Amino acid sequence: MTIIVTGAAGFIGANIVQALNVRGEKNIIAVDDLRPADKYRNLADLDIIDYLDKDEFLEAFRSGRFGKVKAVFHEGACSDTMETDGIFMMANNYRYTMDLLDICTAQKVQLLYASSAATYGGSDVFVESREHEKPLNIYGYSKFLFDQVMRKRFAEKTNTAQVVGFRYFNVYGPRESHKGRMASVAFHQYYQYKANGHVKLFGEYGGYGAGEQSRDFVSVEDVVKVNLFFLDHPEISGIFNLGSGRAQPFNDVAHAVANAMRKLDKAAPASLQELVKEKAIEYIPFPDALKGRYQCFTQADLTKLRAAGYAEPFLTVEQGVGRYIEWLEANSSFLANPL
């Protein structure tokens, strides 16, 4: 049976395709917008049976061209939180997903889609509940609105197959180089350290000390595992947080990156204080442009995910970032012109 992955040349989508390949799944249709064209690298070592541009995909799917489809992983979206074109964002993220939902409903196809922790925006509580959702930008709103539609459909029990939304927190890991400035902190710090021997972090802001603003950093390895868990449990629908369940400061990421790079140089690990003293970690003033628009703390509440039966542990920053740095080093040619 066919599996479709939208955003297949993107970060999370390509990792899902890879994991499906490891399972022996090759009957995969990849959907994306290959602008920039360099994203093709994320597909070059993967097995798929067809590729479609996102603009031709919906009509092809609606017409039944793919025969019996088991599931759609919908990872395709504009994820640029600085995008200000609301018409583009709503058409690309909200309306496109609504059309895809209608087709999956008509054909009784499982739909596993990317929501976002951006739906919480300015909230300081990260529980999958309407009162905690306060998106701060049009990206967050585009994801929030589709989640609202799904809540109504869940209540009305109008779905013909599984629908699951994943509120991704700060995801990092392999195959994100095409994202440029929207790539993870770990990715950027790796290249900073490689080029300059140090990494930069924001200084004090929002009541947090230098580098102590904290996020829920989650490895793409864990994100993929959760996606596949729900693929294997089509009886479960809903909207779920997908983070590690831990808030860790940016200092932890910088510390992990610096020590991973030191390990490659066969140097002993250093403490955070030692790295700051050596100027391997430098703090810069918090930019005025981000004041009032920046989340200083996020932490996924995993109560609902655990109640659904997902029991696997999540990688810590120390574990996941160390593995990621090793991957970046081993795949430097794969990442030509990363920024």
Curated annotation (Swiss-Prot):
EC annotation from Swiss-Prot or TrEMBL: 5.1.3.20
Cofactor note: Binds 1 NADP(+) per subunit.
Residue numbers annotated as active site: Y139, K179
UniProt keyword annotation of Ribonucleoprotein present: no
Binding-site residues, NADP(+): 11-12, 32-33, 39, 54, 75-79, 92, 143, 171, 179
Swiss-Prot/TrEMBL cofactor(s): NADP(+)
Subunit comment: Homopentamer.
GO biological process: ADP-L-glycero-beta-D-manno-heptose biosynthetic process; carbohydrate metabolic process
Protein's pathway: Nucleotide-sugar biosynthesis; ADP-L-glycero-beta-D-manno-heptose biosynthesis; ADP-L-glycero-beta-D-manno-heptose from D-glycero-beta-D-manno-heptose 7-phosphate: step 4/4
Task of the protein: Catalyzes the interconversion between ADP-D-glycero-beta-D-manno-heptose and ADP-L-glycero-beta-D-manno-heptose via an epimerization at carbon 6 of the heptose.
Presence of the UniProt keyword Manganese in the record: no
NCBIfam families attached to this UniProt entry: heptose_epim
A GO MF label: ADP-glyceromanno-heptose 6-epimerase activity
Protein name: ADP-L-glycero-D-manno-heptose-6-epimerase
Keywords for this protein: Carbohydrate metabolism, Isomerase, NADP
Similarity field: Belongs to the NAD(P)-dependent epimerase/dehydratase family. HldD subfamily.
Domain notes from UniProt: Contains a large N-terminal NADP-binding domain, and a smaller C-terminal substrate-binding domain.
Lineage of origin: Bacteria, Pseudomonadati, Pseudomonadota, Betaproteobacteria, Burkholderiales
Record's catalysed reaction(s): ADP-D-glycero-beta-D-manno-heptose = ADP-L-glycero-beta-D-manno-heptose
CDD domains tied to this protein: ADP_GME_SDR_e
Amino acids binding substrate: N170, R181, H188, F202, G203, E204, Y205, R215, Y294
